[in-house]
Protein backbone atom coordinates (compact mmCIF):
# COMPACT_ATOMS: atom_id res chain seq x y z
CA UNK A 1 0.00 0.00 0.00
CA UNK A 2 1.12 3.55 -0.72
CA UNK A 3 1.67 6.66 1.31
CA UNK A 4 -1.73 8.41 1.57
CA UNK A 5 0.12 11.74 1.72
CA UNK A 6 -0.94 15.01 3.21
CA UNK A 7 1.03 17.66 1.42
CA UNK A 8 2.33 21.01 2.44
CA UNK A 9 0.08 23.86 1.38
CA UNK A 10 -1.82 23.96 -0.83
CA UNK A 11 -3.10 20.40 -1.19
CA UNK A 12 -2.30 19.08 -4.68
CA UNK A 13 -5.57 17.70 -6.06
CA UNK A 14 -6.78 16.20 -9.32
CA UNK A 15 -10.25 15.81 -10.78
CA UNK A 16 -11.15 12.56 -12.55
CA UNK A 17 -14.19 13.19 -14.72
CA UNK A 18 -14.58 16.25 -16.92
CA UNK A 19 -18.36 16.52 -17.20
CA UNK A 20 -20.60 19.11 -15.55
CA UNK A 21 -19.79 18.06 -11.99
CA UNK A 22 -16.06 17.86 -12.59
CA UNK A 23 -15.95 21.22 -14.35
CA UNK A 24 -18.02 22.97 -11.69
CA UNK A 25 -15.77 21.40 -9.07
CA UNK A 26 -12.74 22.83 -10.87
CA UNK A 27 -14.13 26.37 -10.79
CA UNK A 28 -14.84 26.06 -7.07
CA UNK A 29 -11.33 24.78 -6.38
CA UNK A 30 -9.91 27.80 -8.22
CA UNK A 31 -11.29 29.98 -5.40
CA UNK A 32 -9.82 27.88 -2.60
CA UNK A 33 -6.64 29.02 -0.88
CA UNK A 34 -6.11 25.50 0.49
CA UNK A 35 -6.42 23.47 -2.72
CA UNK A 36 -4.66 23.54 -6.07
CA UNK A 37 -5.91 21.53 -9.05
CA UNK A 38 -2.83 20.12 -10.76
CA UNK A 39 -4.65 17.79 -13.18
CA UNK A 40 -8.05 17.68 -14.88
CA UNK A 41 -8.39 14.14 -16.18
CA UNK A 42 -10.93 12.50 -18.47
CA UNK A 43 -11.28 10.57 -21.71
CA UNK A 44 -11.86 13.22 -24.36
CA UNK A 45 -9.45 16.08 -24.87
CA UNK A 46 -12.15 17.95 -26.82
CA UNK A 47 -14.84 17.84 -24.14
CA UNK A 48 -16.27 21.20 -23.09
CA UNK A 49 -14.87 20.64 -19.61
CA UNK A 50 -11.35 20.11 -20.95
CA UNK A 51 -11.66 23.23 -23.10
CA UNK A 52 -12.69 25.24 -20.04
CA UNK A 53 -9.86 23.82 -17.93
CA UNK A 54 -7.25 24.63 -20.56
CA UNK A 55 -8.57 28.19 -20.75
CA UNK A 56 -7.82 28.45 -17.02
CA UNK A 57 -4.31 27.10 -17.47
CA UNK A 58 -5.04 23.83 -15.67
CA UNK A 59 -3.05 20.80 -16.90
CA UNK A 60 -5.33 18.32 -18.69
CA UNK A 61 -5.08 14.67 -19.70
CA UNK A 62 -7.31 12.28 -21.66
CA UNK A 63 -5.61 9.17 -20.22
CA UNK A 64 -8.30 8.63 -17.56
CA UNK A 65 -7.15 6.42 -14.67
CA UNK A 66 -3.90 5.58 -16.47
CA UNK A 67 -2.76 9.17 -15.87
CA UNK A 68 -2.46 8.44 -12.16
CA UNK A 69 -0.34 5.36 -12.71
CA UNK A 70 2.15 7.65 -14.45
CA UNK A 71 1.85 10.74 -12.22
CA UNK A 72 0.54 9.53 -8.87
CA UNK A 73 3.49 10.84 -6.87
CA UNK A 74 2.48 14.43 -7.72
CA UNK A 75 -1.03 14.18 -6.30
CA UNK A 76 -2.34 14.16 -2.74
CA UNK A 77 -6.04 13.67 -3.43
CA UNK A 78 -8.34 12.76 -6.33
CA UNK A 79 -11.96 13.83 -6.70
CA UNK A 80 -13.73 11.07 -8.65
CA UNK A 81 -16.59 12.69 -10.58
CA UNK A 82 -17.26 9.82 -13.00
CA UNK A 83 -19.85 7.11 -12.26
CA UNK A 84 -20.42 4.45 -9.61
CA UNK A 85 -19.44 1.71 -12.04
CA UNK A 86 -16.23 3.50 -12.98
CA UNK A 87 -15.32 4.22 -9.37
CA UNK A 88 -15.33 0.51 -8.59
CA UNK A 89 -12.47 0.26 -11.09
CA UNK A 90 -10.69 3.44 -10.00
CA UNK A 91 -10.78 2.91 -6.23
CA UNK A 92 -8.39 -0.07 -5.90
CA UNK A 93 -5.93 1.52 -8.33
CA UNK A 94 -5.85 4.81 -6.43
CA UNK A 95 -5.54 2.98 -3.13
CA UNK A 96 -2.58 0.99 -4.40
CA UNK A 97 -0.98 4.25 -5.51
CA UNK A 98 -1.52 5.72 -2.06
CA UNK A 99 -3.74 8.56 -3.21
CA UNK A 100 -6.64 9.71 -1.08
CA UNK A 101 -10.02 9.81 -2.79
CA UNK A 102 -13.17 11.87 -2.42
CA UNK A 103 -15.82 9.97 -4.35
CA UNK A 104 -18.71 11.99 -5.78
CA UNK A 105 -20.43 8.87 -7.17
CA UNK A 106 -22.84 6.64 -5.23
CA UNK A 107 -20.41 3.70 -5.32
CA UNK A 108 -20.34 3.18 -1.51
CA UNK A 109 -16.67 2.11 -1.51
CA UNK A 110 -15.48 4.55 1.14
CA UNK A 111 -16.94 5.88 4.37
CA UNK A 112 -20.09 7.92 3.83
CA UNK A 113 -19.41 11.53 4.67
CA UNK A 114 -21.65 14.49 5.48
CA UNK A 115 -19.39 17.43 6.41
CA UNK A 116 -21.91 19.08 8.75
CA UNK A 117 -22.08 15.84 10.74
CA UNK A 118 -18.64 14.24 10.38
CA UNK A 119 -16.23 17.06 9.51
CA UNK A 120 -12.77 16.15 10.82
CA UNK A 121 -13.71 12.78 12.34
CA UNK A 122 -13.08 10.88 9.07
CA UNK A 123 -9.73 12.35 8.08
CA UNK A 124 -7.91 9.06 8.61
CA UNK A 125 -10.03 7.43 5.90
CA UNK A 126 -8.39 6.95 2.50
CA UNK A 127 -11.71 7.07 0.59
CA UNK A 128 -14.68 9.28 1.45
CA UNK A 129 -18.01 8.77 -0.29
CA UNK A 130 -20.08 11.93 -0.59
CA UNK A 131 -23.30 9.87 -0.73
CA UNK A 132 -25.64 11.62 -3.21
CA UNK A 133 -27.09 15.08 -3.75
CA UNK A 134 -30.27 14.09 -1.92
CA UNK A 135 -28.17 12.48 0.78
CA UNK A 136 -26.17 15.67 1.33
CA UNK A 137 -29.37 17.72 1.57
CA UNK A 138 -31.31 15.36 3.82
CA UNK A 139 -28.68 13.71 6.02
CA UNK A 140 -28.06 16.66 8.37
CA UNK A 141 -31.81 16.70 9.03
CA UNK A 142 -32.07 12.92 9.42
CA UNK A 143 -29.10 12.94 11.79
CA UNK A 144 -30.71 15.68 13.91
CA UNK A 145 -33.95 13.68 14.09
CA UNK A 146 -32.04 10.56 15.10
CA UNK A 147 -30.12 12.43 17.81
CA UNK A 148 -33.18 14.02 19.42
CA UNK A 149 -36.10 11.62 19.01
CA UNK A 150 -36.98 8.18 20.29
CA UNK A 151 -37.38 5.16 18.06
CA UNK A 152 -37.78 6.10 14.37
CA UNK A 153 -40.11 3.60 12.76
CA UNK A 154 -39.82 4.98 9.23
CA UNK A 155 -37.89 7.76 7.51
CA UNK A 156 -38.54 8.91 3.96
CA UNK A 157 -36.77 11.49 1.81
CA UNK A 158 -38.22 12.97 -1.38
CA UNK A 159 -35.92 15.13 -3.50
CA UNK A 160 -37.19 17.03 -6.52
CA UNK A 161 -34.66 18.40 -8.99
CA UNK A 162 -34.87 20.08 -12.38
CA UNK A 163 -34.72 17.53 -15.19
CA UNK A 164 -32.12 19.67 -16.96
CA UNK A 165 -29.78 19.32 -13.97
CA UNK A 166 -29.80 15.51 -14.23
CA UNK A 167 -27.06 14.60 -16.66
CA UNK A 168 -26.20 11.19 -18.12
CA UNK A 169 -24.27 10.03 -15.04
CA UNK A 170 -27.15 10.94 -12.71
CA UNK A 171 -29.65 9.04 -14.84
CA UNK A 172 -27.29 6.07 -15.21
CA UNK A 173 -26.81 5.87 -11.44
CA UNK A 174 -30.46 6.06 -10.32
CA UNK A 175 -30.51 2.63 -8.67
CA UNK A 176 -27.23 3.35 -6.90
CA UNK A 177 -28.59 6.77 -5.90
CA UNK A 178 -31.55 5.16 -4.13
CA UNK A 179 -29.54 2.45 -2.37
CA UNK A 180 -26.74 4.77 -1.27
CA UNK A 181 -29.09 7.48 0.01
CA UNK A 182 -31.15 4.96 1.96
CA UNK A 183 -28.03 3.45 3.51
CA UNK A 184 -26.77 6.86 4.63
CA UNK A 185 -30.16 7.76 6.10
CA UNK A 186 -30.29 4.52 8.07
CA UNK A 187 -26.75 4.95 9.40
CA UNK A 188 -27.21 8.56 10.45
CA UNK A 189 -30.76 8.44 11.83
CA UNK A 190 -30.96 4.92 13.22
CA UNK A 191 -34.35 4.51 11.49
CA UNK A 192 -35.64 0.96 11.20
CA UNK A 193 -36.85 1.55 7.64
CA UNK A 194 -35.75 4.20 5.14
CA UNK A 195 -36.90 5.18 1.68
CA UNK A 196 -35.41 7.63 -0.83
CA UNK A 197 -37.30 9.02 -3.81
CA UNK A 198 -35.88 11.20 -6.59
CA UNK A 199 -38.23 13.22 -8.80
CA UNK A 200 -36.95 14.74 -12.06
CA UNK A 201 -39.19 17.75 -12.64
CA UNK A 202 -39.42 18.95 -16.28
CA UNK A 203 -41.07 22.26 -15.35
CA UNK A 204 -39.96 25.48 -17.06
CA UNK A 205 -38.56 27.68 -15.67
CA UNK A 206 -36.44 25.11 -13.89
CA UNK A 207 -37.09 24.56 -10.19
CA UNK A 208 -34.49 24.72 -7.44
CA UNK A 209 -33.64 21.49 -5.66
CA UNK A 210 -36.20 20.72 -2.96
CA UNK A 211 -35.78 17.95 -0.38
CA UNK A 212 -38.34 16.89 2.23
CA UNK A 213 -37.67 14.55 5.14
CA UNK A 214 -40.56 12.68 6.75
CA UNK A 215 -40.01 10.69 9.95
CA UNK A 216 -42.52 8.61 11.90
CA UNK A 217 -41.36 8.64 15.52
CA UNK A 218 -42.63 7.81 18.98
CA UNK A 219 -43.49 10.92 21.03
CA UNK A 220 -42.02 13.66 18.79
CA UNK A 221 -40.03 16.34 20.65
CA UNK A 222 -39.90 19.45 18.49
CA UNK A 223 -38.04 21.57 21.03
CA UNK A 224 -35.07 19.21 21.14
CA UNK A 225 -35.09 18.90 17.36
CA UNK A 226 -35.27 22.64 16.77
CA UNK A 227 -32.34 23.22 19.12
CA UNK A 228 -30.08 20.76 17.27
CA UNK A 229 -31.25 22.01 13.87
CA UNK A 230 -30.23 25.52 14.92
CA UNK A 231 -26.68 24.15 15.12
CA UNK A 232 -26.46 21.73 12.20
CA UNK A 233 -28.16 23.93 9.59
CA UNK A 234 -25.65 26.81 9.97
CA UNK A 235 -22.86 24.22 9.79
CA UNK A 236 -24.29 23.09 6.45
CA UNK A 237 -24.77 26.64 5.21
CA UNK A 238 -21.11 27.37 5.98
CA UNK A 239 -20.15 25.35 2.88
CA UNK A 240 -23.48 25.40 0.98
CA UNK A 241 -24.68 29.04 1.09
CA UNK A 242 -27.83 28.24 -0.89
CA UNK A 243 -29.11 25.70 1.68
CA UNK A 244 -32.29 27.07 3.28
CA UNK A 245 -35.09 25.63 5.39
CA UNK A 246 -38.37 26.09 3.53
CA UNK A 247 -40.77 24.43 5.98
CA UNK A 248 -40.76 23.02 9.47
CA UNK A 249 -40.04 21.15 11.42
CA UNK A 250 -43.71 20.40 11.95
CA UNK A 251 -45.55 17.41 13.43
CA UNK A 252 -48.70 15.86 12.01
CA UNK A 253 -50.10 12.58 13.38
CA UNK A 254 -46.76 11.56 14.84
CA UNK A 255 -44.87 12.36 11.65
CA UNK A 256 -42.13 14.99 11.59
CA UNK A 257 -41.67 16.91 8.34
CA UNK A 258 -38.83 19.24 7.33
CA UNK A 259 -38.26 20.73 3.87
CA UNK A 260 -35.13 22.43 2.54
CA UNK A 261 -34.33 24.13 -0.75
CA UNK A 262 -30.88 24.29 -2.28
CA UNK A 263 -29.84 26.91 -4.81
CA UNK A 264 -26.44 26.79 -6.45
CA UNK A 265 -23.97 29.65 -6.70
CA UNK A 266 -23.81 29.44 -10.51
CA UNK A 267 -20.13 28.71 -11.11
CA UNK A 268 -20.28 26.43 -14.16
CA UNK A 269 -23.82 25.17 -13.63
CA UNK A 270 -27.09 27.13 -13.52
CA UNK A 271 -28.19 28.36 -10.11
CA UNK A 272 -31.18 25.99 -10.15
CA UNK A 273 -28.78 23.01 -10.15
CA UNK A 274 -28.43 23.06 -6.38
CA UNK A 275 -28.39 19.27 -6.41
CA UNK A 276 -25.02 19.30 -8.16
CA UNK A 277 -23.75 22.31 -6.24
CA UNK A 278 -24.34 20.77 -2.82
CA UNK A 279 -22.31 17.62 -3.44
CA UNK A 280 -19.43 19.63 -4.93
CA UNK A 281 -19.46 22.04 -2.01
CA UNK A 282 -19.44 19.12 0.42
CA UNK A 283 -16.52 17.49 -1.39
CA UNK A 284 -14.47 20.68 -1.28
CA UNK A 285 -15.28 21.19 2.41
CA UNK A 286 -13.77 17.79 3.18
CA UNK A 287 -10.73 18.34 0.95
CA UNK A 288 -10.07 21.58 2.80
CA UNK A 289 -10.27 19.68 6.09
CA UNK A 290 -7.49 17.43 4.80
CA UNK A 291 -5.47 20.52 3.87
CA UNK A 292 -5.98 22.09 7.31
CA UNK A 293 -4.85 18.88 8.96
CA UNK A 294 -1.72 18.92 6.81
CA UNK A 295 -0.93 22.48 7.86
CA UNK A 296 -1.19 21.52 11.52
CA UNK A 297 1.31 18.69 11.20
Swiss-Prot record:
It is an enzyme of class 1 (oxidoreductase). One of its GO terms (molecular function) is NAD binding. It catalyses: acetaldehyde + NAD(+) + CoA = acetyl-CoA + NADH + H(+). InterPro entries: Acetaldehyde_dehydrogenase, Acetylaldehyde_DH_C, NAD(P)-bd_dom_sf, Semialdehyde_DH_NAD-bd. Its EC number is 1.2.1.10. Keywords: Aromatic hydrocarbons catabolism, NAD, Oxidoreductase. NAD(+) binds at residues 18-21, 165-173, 275. One of its GO terms (biological process) is catabolic process. The keyword NAD applies. It comes from the Bacteria. CDD domains: ALDH_C (cd23933). The active site is at residue 133. The keyword Oxidoreductase applies. Belongs to the acetaldehyde dehydrogenase family. HAMAP family: Ac_ald_DH_ac. NCBIfam families: ac_ald_DH_ac, PRK08300.1. This is Acetaldehyde dehydrogenase. It comes from Spirochaeta aurantia.
Amino acid sequence: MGRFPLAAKPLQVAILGTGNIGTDLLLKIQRSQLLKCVAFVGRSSQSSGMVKARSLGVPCSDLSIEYFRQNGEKIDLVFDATSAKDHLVHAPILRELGIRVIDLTPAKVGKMCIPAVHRSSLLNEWNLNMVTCGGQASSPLAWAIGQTQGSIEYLEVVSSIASKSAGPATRLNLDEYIHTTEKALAELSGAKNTKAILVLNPAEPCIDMQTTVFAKVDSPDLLKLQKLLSEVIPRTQAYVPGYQVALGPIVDNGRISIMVRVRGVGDYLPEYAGNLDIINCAAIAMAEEYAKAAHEQ
